[in-house]
């Protein structure tokens, strides 16, 4: 490249090596990035990476599938860019690290969209066709968004849970876990959403504040004599009264079937204006105050003495349909934190209630379950039939009051379960569902699912490490997994069930395979259109097709089966090295994947789990529409560049919350500019350097150049150790320090004089350029995983013959003799230079000098510092960026100092140094001897700097 012509005549007369580069100072990222995305696609860069990586050890990051609905948001951007950084850094570390993106396609949100657009009365076949089309459209939209962020992957062949092959393999996975004995059907309270009309997974439940009625209700004595004896009395002092419960769900009272007391809690019989009331002794004072009563404790007894006593239903006086009694069952889960120390039990609407009643001999057919799937009571329920439970709440309170059973009615604000899709309250509701049993003995007599999964958690590496305890606790305490859903757009639980007994067809495993073969050809629609007689002949008179679909968490939770070992088995492998998702996935994809793999394979589907936090604004608030603090990644990419989003993510400790604001983005942009300016300097000063022709061997380099390369190699080793542990923010922090301080603040600063003023092909300049070449080789590669657009842009300027930086591996720096000692020596020199710089700044502030080149310094130093400084000889002035420098030996560190004086000599017009020999050549009165030699003779000789 030719030298850039300067405007001033002296520079034209005495040229310096000021070079230019096509790598511009301004990134113009919003304009250039989309061109790079097109370029990568057109030239098949991802495919070239795959071809280059063939035969290397595999590293598999398995993509947790985003849901195919809606635009990508900042959380998506964080997740996909983190994955991209992992994959790129692993490829550059010498692995074969493919990236196959995927999408979760079935389930409620898409079905809701179809209902919104086309109504609820569409035939199932049309729902499925429209759902497929909708999901496909959403995938294309999201895919474009992810590509725009610089994410490289198999975009032409992603996995989709709705692809026929994946749907078929999921049915086969279901067959396997049935064969292994994990699946059963039963009546159980499950999370139920009235708007979905379906059971919900634990991960689909969120908690929001809600105000509900809270009531204290009296269940009148049904067995006064037995009650008296339980309290050690011959008889009750009076007939009126009963046992008191507290509840926030009045709508469950019509279905009450029992009362729960703790066996070891002491209960009191309290004489009040409302009769004799039974409650926990330690709650008497608070309850009397709440009820507005005065009371006297007549007797006390332990809870276990009251077991099996019966009390009248509180609505018995309101309608004959409630003339029944409720027995006392003992339960360890009863507490005295609030209420009366007595829990009313409606087994259809509470997990503990259900478990307690079943343990006391209640059968499924005994359980009263009047709430239908849409939230209304059955028409035949006395007093409240046909009402929604929420509308019934005040009417139940009124009926209790009229029956004389209400002691208190207030409102209570509490955190309550809501559907994550509809944002509406949900309930526990006993329904007949298909479950995976956590503590069921599998067919082979081995460990239970819970035991296997807990062992698998222990065998998994967690980043950050606290994730292990969190997932362990979730698995240890979770209920059985409700596998079934009552929807259309989902993979069918393709069973034939006996119409009378509910038993599975004896040929179920064989029949599931037959269905899977059909689904492989026609999709899940094949089950909808299948005539049972095709597969089971006359048995169709006895068996009916099961209409349930699989929980969508089973879809994504079995991707290790139908993607890693199914649709993409040629690219991927089982188990994956890493699953990487937001921290909510401990109860979502990490969780469901662990359970399915534990059932299918007896192990986790991943070797490591990496968790990132959520995005918050600059004040630490969660992003929400109501606060108006959301940040759209598209908007930021189009205004500042996707590179700024990538750098923000890479520079943030993702193990906690990721804070973002305009102020934070401004700081990130400034950091980006500093890195870009460093790259521009490197590329400009290498633009006339041909490594094959101009490079010097390391032993011929100047000492500071050997130091710079040794230091860069040591830094790279640190960075690669961070990359290996997925620690990106220390990589960014160290690289920013490297660019601004180690290079910009020291090495490049020192180098400018040599690069600009030495003869273009001199050993001094070629030494500097050879070192810069190696530094640039290494720097661009370690930047590439996160600053992908910029690293590629710079790489193509640096090595135009190379197709892409992403097929490279991390740089092998040349060996530098005595590298550790060299780095230690120059670390010492930089420390002294810092003291000199401070002294120069003080002299400048006092108007004793202008630039540092106007100064001559004397450094008094002792010991190793003196030795290091003295070893540089006349080159010390270049390191200190002064026109003259001397070093004087002193005995003690306390005697060390820096003296600054203004030079008495003239300033060279070309190099700006103040030297005694300026004008020594009469024909060149403004030129120093050094510049004269560099321009017209053999050039100056340097050894250190």
UniProtKB/Swiss-Prot annotation:
Binds 1 zinc ion per subunit. The keyword Ion transport does not apply. Gene3D superfamilies: 1.10.730.20, HUPs, Valyl/Leucyl/Isoleucyl-tRNA synthetase, editing domain. Its cofactor is Zn(2+). One of its GO terms (biological process) is isoleucyl-tRNA aminoacylation. Keywords: Aminoacyl-tRNA synthetase, ATP-binding, Cytoplasm, Ligase, Metal-binding, Nucleotide-binding, Protein biosynthesis, Zinc. This is Isoleucine--tRNA ligase. It comes from Burkholderia thailandensis (strain ATCC 700388 / DSM 13276 / CCUG 48851 / CIP 106301 / E264).
């Amino acid at each position: 490249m030719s030298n850039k012509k300067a405007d001033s005549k002296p520079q034209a007369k005495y040229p310096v090596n000021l070079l230019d580069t096509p790598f511009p100072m301004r990134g113009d990222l919003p304009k250039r990035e989309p061109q790079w995305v097109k370029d990568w696609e057109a030239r098949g860069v991802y495919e070239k990476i795959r071809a280059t990586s063939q035969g290397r050890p595999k590293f598999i990051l398995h993509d947790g599938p985003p849901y195919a609905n809606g635009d990508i948001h900042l959380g998506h951007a964080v997740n996909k860019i983190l994955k991209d950084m992992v994959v790129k850094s692993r490829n550059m570390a010498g692995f074969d690290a493919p990236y196959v993106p995927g999408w979760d396609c079935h389930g409620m949100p898409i079905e809701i969209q179809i209902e919104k657009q086309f109504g609820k009365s569409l035939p199932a076949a049309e729902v499925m066709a429209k759902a497929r089309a909708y999901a496909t459209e959403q995938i294309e939209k999201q895919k474009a968004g992810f590509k725009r962020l610089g994410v490289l992957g198999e975009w032409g062949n992603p996995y989709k849970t709705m692809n026929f092959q994946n749907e078929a393999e999921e049915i086969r996975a279901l067959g396997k876990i049935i064969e292994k004995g994990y699946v059963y059907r039963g009546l159980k309270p499950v999370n139920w959403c009235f708007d979905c009309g379906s059971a919900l997974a634990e991960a689909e439940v969120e908690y929001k504040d809600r105000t509900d009625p809270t009531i204290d209700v009296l269940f009148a004595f049904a067995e006064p004599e037995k009650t008296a004896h339980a309290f050690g009395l011959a008889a009750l002092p009076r007939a009126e009264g009963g046992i008191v419960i507290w509840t926030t769900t009045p709508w469950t009272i019509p279905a009450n079937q029992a009362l729960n007391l703790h066996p070891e809690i002491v209960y009191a019989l309290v004489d009040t204006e409302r009769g004799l009331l039974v409650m926990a002794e330690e709650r008497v004072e608070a309850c009397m105050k709440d009820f507005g009563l005065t009371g006297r404790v007549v007797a006390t007894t332990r809870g276990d003495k009251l077991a099996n006593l019966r009390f009248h239903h509180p609505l018995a006086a309101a309608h004959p349909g409630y003339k029944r009694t409720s027995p006392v069952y003992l339960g360890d889960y009863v507490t005295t934190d609030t209420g009366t120390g007595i829990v009313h039990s409606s087994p259809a609407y509470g997990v503990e209630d259900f478990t307690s009643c079943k343990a006391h001999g209640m059968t499924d057919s005994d359980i009263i379950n009047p709430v239908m799937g849409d939230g209304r009571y059955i028409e035949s329920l006395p007093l409240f039939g046909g009402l929604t439970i929420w509308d019934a709440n005040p009417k139940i309170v009124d009926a209790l009051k009229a029956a004389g059973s209400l002691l208190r009615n207030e409102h209570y604000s509490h955190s309550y379960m809501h559907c994550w899709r509809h944002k509406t309250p949900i309930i526990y509701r006993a329904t007949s569902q298909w479950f995976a049993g956590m503590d069921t003995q599998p067919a082979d007599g081995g460990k239970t699912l819970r035991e296997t999964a807990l062992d698998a958690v222990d065998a998994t590496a967690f980043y950050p490490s606290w994730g292990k305890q969190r997932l362990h606790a979730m698995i240890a305490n979770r209920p059985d997994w409700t596998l079934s859903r009552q929807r259309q757009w989902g993979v069918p639980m393709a069973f034939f069930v006996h119409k009378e007994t509910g038993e599975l067809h004896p040929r179920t495993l064989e029949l599931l395979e037959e269905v899977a073969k059909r689904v492989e050809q026609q999709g899940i629609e094949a089950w909808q259109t299948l005539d049972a007689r095709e597969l089971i002949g006359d048995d169709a008179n006895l068996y009916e097709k099961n209409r349930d679909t699989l929980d969508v968490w089973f879809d994504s939770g079995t991707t290790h089966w139908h993607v890693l070992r199914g649709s993409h088995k040629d690219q991927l492998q089982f188990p994956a090295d890493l699953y990487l998702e937001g921290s909510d996935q401990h109860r979502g994809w990490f969780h469901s994947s662990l359970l399915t793999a534990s059932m299918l394979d007896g192990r986790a589907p991943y070797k490591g789990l990496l968790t990132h936090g959520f995005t918050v604004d600059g004040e630490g608030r969660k992003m929400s529409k109501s606060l108006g603090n959301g940040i759209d990644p598209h908007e930021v990419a189009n205004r500042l560049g996707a590179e700024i989003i990538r750098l923000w993510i890479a520079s943030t400790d993702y193990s906690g919350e990721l804070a973002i604001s305009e102020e934070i983005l401004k700081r990130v942009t400034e950091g980006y500019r500093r890195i870009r300016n460093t790259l521009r300097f490197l590329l400009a000063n290498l633009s006339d350097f041909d490594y094959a022709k101009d490079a010097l061997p390391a032993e011929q380099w100047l000492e500071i150049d050997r130091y710079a390369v040794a230091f860069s190699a040591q830094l790279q080793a640190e960075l690669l150790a961070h990359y290996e542990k997925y620690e990106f923010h220390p990589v960014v922090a160290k690289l920013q320090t490297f660019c601004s301080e180690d290079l910009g603040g020291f090495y490049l600063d020192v180098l400018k004089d040599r690069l600009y003023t030495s003869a273009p092909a001199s050993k001094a300049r070629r030494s500097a350029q050879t070192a810069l070449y190696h530094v640039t080789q290494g720097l661009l590669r370690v930047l590439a995983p996160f600053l992908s657009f910029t690293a590629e842009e710079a790489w193509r300027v640096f090595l135009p013959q190379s197709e892409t930086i992403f097929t490279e591996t991390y740089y092998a720096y040349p060996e530098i003799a005595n590298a550790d000692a060299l780095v230690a020596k120059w670390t010492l020199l930089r420390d002294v230079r810092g003291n000199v710089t401070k002294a120069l700044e003080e002299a400048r502030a006092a108007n004793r000098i202008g630039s540092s080149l106007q100064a001559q310094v004397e450094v008094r130093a002792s010991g190793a510092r003196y030795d290091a400084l003295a070893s540089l000889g006349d080159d010390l002035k270049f390191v200190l960026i002064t026109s003259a420098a001397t070093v004087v030996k002193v005995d003690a560190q306390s005697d060390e100092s820096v003296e600054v004086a203004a030079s008495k000599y003239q300033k060279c017009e070309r190099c700006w140094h103040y030297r005694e020999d300026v004008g020594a050549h009469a024909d060149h009165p403004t030129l120093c001897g050094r510049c004269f030699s560099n321009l017209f003779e053999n050039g100056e000789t340097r050894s250190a700097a």
